[in-house]
């Protein structure tokens, strides 16, 4: 058995930004069990059932996954990763103590994504281009820490470690944005989505919450945590952050596995991809990926996936998920020759083996090529993009007339205090489901 690594975490990782005096008789739940309950029972989480994952709600086929079912599957995979890591590397068991923590992080990871998937995200980023931008992960942190009405001012008031776990990109959007900025369009229908993909990060409006989350870190760790990946100089490419907590690294792997495999299952069932496409773009490459399991079983997996029999397809999907999940190990987040983190939460991350990382990238690229960038999917995304931009334009033209009362009050308060009142409009639209946004669009623009 491997020697246990001495891991001592500061008790401040279980702190909440606001002390609570809840009337809860004989409540024996842990901090992270309470976090999980808050997320699961939140309105923002429930709304994920009517938000686009890949195939929008209202599709002709009800088999597809929504943001909500995707989040549930990410949670299941994430806790599975934790369980196998505890067995495979028991020396880290004191770092991976809580299943509820991982469930909380995974359930919450997509909670800030707007209606109509990436089309909605691009639309809001364009409309907020002069007011701090918009990005789904940054919106997730904002909902959890400010917007969800579990408390008056602090959102769900989650534990610091939970918030650190959803912090995939610990930098502000203006720090990672490319130097190049496209010209504004004169007609919203002419907006090219490829030019307005947001960088990954959080809003300047939420600077105080980032400082609170990272408060237990040493100054050296804070500096290292904020560094970017090395990349060639290119004025048109956004920078990317390099580091995240171990909890976040597990969630991100679970998210990637769910995207690469479960979204593939949706595409097979709905007839979007064919056996020939699978063979050419995936099977032929995985047969030589360097992993013994994939090389030995890839042909059999293809037979199962395209057999037309649900139990066979499920067996093939489950086999791939298991193969990826069981190839994950905990390693240092920095190179040997580099300075390492002092905090154990940042010193270690979860990683796929190189061959399995290659295999997962092949699967993700396949989903991207044949599903996400499928012309039919892109038309749906374009339509959603137009709906979101038109709604924003209307609300921003006369907020006092068109915003709901609560949002109108917040907009007034922001404007009077000199803070970013445009963010209130973005928050309102980002919280909409696909269906609600469509109905509001019809109410505003479709003749009676």
From Swiss-Prot:
The keyword Nucleotide-binding does not apply. GO terms for biological process: dGTP catabolic process. SMART domains: HDc. InterPro entries: dGTPase (IPR006261), dGTPase-like (IPR050135), dNTPase_2 (IPR023023), HD/PDEase_dom (IPR003607), HD_domain (IPR006674), PHydrolase_assoc_dom (IPR026875). Pfam families: HD, HD_assoc. The keyword Hydrolase applies. PROSITE patterns: HD. Keywords: Hydrolase. It comes from the Bacteria. Residues 67-260 form the HD domain. Belongs to the dGTPase family. Type 2 subfamily. This is Deoxyguanosinetriphosphate triphosphohydrolase-like protein.
